Design a protein with these regions (language model features):
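Ligand-binding "clamshell"
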Residues: 25, 94-105, 152, 194-208
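Pocket-lining segment of extracytoplasmic ligand-binding domains
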Residues: 90-91, 159-162, 166, 170-258
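Short, polar/charged alpha-helical segment
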Residues: 29, 36-66, 72, 78, ...
Length: 317
């Protein structure tokens, strides 16, 4: 099952023609797409503290757009509507190997992932029968690929559970899990923390054997157009991302006071989530090529990237 997007056909003719604005005195513009969840904390800090504006030497307008899936972000990047984006590794690999003109400028976060269940009879993937549904955020999402990795290891076939999958947003999947509409959900923070507050929800099986704690989850992307034609804007985004991560890592209580508003929880609860050992914010986390190679070998992508350098900018290396 190849997940490469047909949207990239003819993509070389798409996009905005941009030139450096710093020398001309014009106002630069950058449009940034992101999703939701604890993994996007650096983006929240960047937005709240105006860090791109701070790191750009000139006038710049930053537009923030929240989208609900990696496929939607890929469509925006392919059309040239989006300049910078953050999303899971898997849709990035699908997009970049299909020809979407962008590169990874760094990893954003690692987050804990768990396969949760409400069914006491499920202790491993071998216990999941054909009638048991598993919610993942999207087909081709990193959660889908992590489940496929576990299926390959335990069942011998990365696609063994494809017919069990239903695509739901993380919040909707959590609601379905708690109500019994699905038997399992493979999800991430903070939804694993919220779901496990319920007495009937437990972890079905660990993912550590296929995706160790600290491996990358969310990556930051920049369009080739912006990277090549507006290097000052690109550098401001990179510097702002690093500054946001430094702020989170060095000022956790202050960061929790900002981030708690996004999830509508107390600062104390947010701080507890952030201090989970699986919650890491760093621009050079491992795992990107491991996932790329797995996806190519198991028909989730049409090919693997030629090299890590071929799909990244210097700030990611």
């Amino acid at each position: 099952m190849i997940l490469a997007a047909s949207m990239v056909l003819g993509v070389s003719g798409c996009g905005k023609s941009q030139k450096s604005t710093q020398d001309s005195g014009n106002t630069a513009k950058v449009k940034i797409a992101y999703q939701y969840g604890l993994a996007y904390a650096p983006l929240t800090i960047m937005q709240e503290q105006g860090l791109i504006e701070k790191n750009y030497d000139g006038d710049i307008e930053v537009e923030w757009v929240s989208l609900n899936s990696g496929s939607a972000i890929n469509e925006g990047m392919a059309s040239g509507d989006i300049d910078v984006a953050c999303m899971g590794i898997a849709p990035f690999i699908s997009g970049v190997t299909a020809g979407i003109p962008y590169k990874m400028y760094g990893t954003i976060a690692a987050q804990p992932h768990e396969l949760l269940t409400n069914d006491d009879s499920i202790h491993s993937l071998k216990d999941i029968t054909d009638d048991k549904k598993i919610s993942v955020v999207n087909i081709g999402s990193i959660q889908h690929i992590l489940l496929a990795m576990l299926a390959k290891e335990e069942l011998g076939d990365a696609h063994a559970l494809d017919n069990n999958l239903v695509a739901m947003s993380h919040p909707d999947g959590m609601t379905a899990l708690m109500s019994g509409s699905v038997a399992c959900q493979l999800t991430t923070a903070p939804y694993i923390f919220k779901a496990k507050e319920q007495d009937n929800i437990k972890e079905a099986e660990s993912l550590d054997s296929v995706w160790p704690e600290g491996n990358a989850f969310i990556v930051g992307l920049v369009s080739d157009d912006l990277y090549e034609n507006q290097p000052e804007v690109y550098q401001a985004v990179v510097d702002a991302t690093q500054e946001a991560m430094d702020y989170i890592n060095n000022n956790q209580e202050e960061a929790a006071n900002i981030l708690c508003k996004k999830e509508d929880v107390s600062a104390e609860t947010m701080l507890g989530w952030m201090q989970d050992p699986g919650c890491v914010y760093d621009m050079k986390l491992p795992g990107v090529m491991d996932m790329a190679n797995f996806m190519a070998e198991n028909d989730f992508a049409d090919k693997a990237p030629e090299s890590f350098e071929a799909i990244t900018t210097e700030s990611a290396r």
